[in-house]
């Protein structure tokens, strides 16, 4: 069911309502497409609807309800993406395969603020060269193209772990201080064993821009496919089906 609350949230010189579905994101996106809401109005689990478009949504079939009921219905449906104020929700991916016999709901969020390091179990880094190409790496364990990343080691900060993974997987040396936070992912297991503690379930996402154009990349021992530089369009051909790709697409736009 499509629900909308009253426009009360002030921003950009107007007030906004929240348009949600308590059934599926597909239903929500289909409705938004029919009424002509732009993709940029989507914030992870809802569309922000300016006051002047509110009546149009009601006329198209959205049910008017309270803000509290919107939150309650989202929570009950499992479609709510929890994030900090000011962060941008990209997508909540439901029951995606994480490993053998394991599935998680994953929240993809863009943010230039780091998350609490105590909650971070891993990090990944988008490395771009002077021309905007992306350093992509092959994961033997997951059998997919991605960007450098991995689990933190004992006593590492998230940025230190990310810089280490970059060096190990590409041969590029960057200082932890050069890595800018650009987003995070939250993993909530729903099927099978969890590989991390419930209270330590965030992956910090970083980005760094190099001054050089396509510096030489070094392959990590034991990896069957060497790292390479790819344009964002080429990277999409390699990885667009992965659960994390919507966040990557947003960051590489």
Q: Could you describe each region identified by the protein language model?
A:
Residues 17-45, 52-54, 60:
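Basic nucleic-acid-binding interfaces
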Residues 204-207, 216-246:
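NUDIX/MutT-family hydrolases
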Residues 128-168:
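Conserved Nudix-box catalytic region and its N-terminal flanking loop in Nudix hydrolases
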Residues 44-81:
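Short, compact, well-ordered microdomains
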Residues 173-184:
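A short coil-to-beta-strand element that immediately follows conserved catalytic motifs
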Residues 185-216:
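Active-site-adjacent beta-strand/loop module that shapes the phosphate/pyrophosphate-binding cleft
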Residues 2-20:
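Short glycine-/aliphatic-rich beta-strand segments at the starts of folded cytosolic domains
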Residues 71, 78-124:
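Acidic, metal-coordinating catalytic segment for phosphate/diphosphate chemistry
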């Amino acid at each position: 069911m499509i629900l909308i609350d009253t426009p009360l949230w002030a921003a950009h010189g107007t007030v906004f309502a929240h348009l949600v579905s308590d059934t599926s994101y597909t239903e929500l996106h289909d409705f938004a497409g029919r009424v002509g809401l732009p993709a940029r109005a989507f914030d992870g689990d809802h569309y922000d609807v300016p006051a002047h478009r509110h009546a149009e949504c009601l006329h198209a079939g959205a049910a008017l309800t309270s803000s509290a009921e919107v939150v309650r219905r989202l929570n009950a449906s499992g479609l709510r993406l929890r994030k900090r104020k000011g962060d941008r929700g990209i997508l909540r991916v439901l029951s995606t395969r994480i490993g053998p016999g394991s599935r998680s709901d994953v929240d993809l969020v863009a943010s230039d603020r780091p998350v609490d390091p105590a909650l971070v179990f891993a990090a990944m880094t988008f490395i771009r060269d002077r021309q905007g190409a992306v350093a992509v790496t092959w994961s033997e364990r997951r059998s997919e193209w991605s960007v450098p990343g991995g689990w933190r080691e004992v006593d590492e900060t998230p940025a230190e772990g990310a810089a280490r993974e970059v060096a190990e997987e590409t041969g590029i040396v960057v200082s932890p201080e050069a890595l800018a936070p650009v987003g995070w992912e939250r993993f909530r297991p729903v099927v099978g064993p969890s590989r991390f503690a419930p209270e330590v379930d965030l992956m910090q996402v970083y980005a760094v821009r190099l001054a050089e154009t396509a510096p030489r990349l070094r392959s990590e021992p034991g990896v069957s496919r060497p790292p390479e530089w790819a344009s964002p369009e080429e990277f999409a051909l390699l990885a667009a089906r992965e659960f994390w790709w919507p966040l990557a697409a947003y960051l590489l736009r």
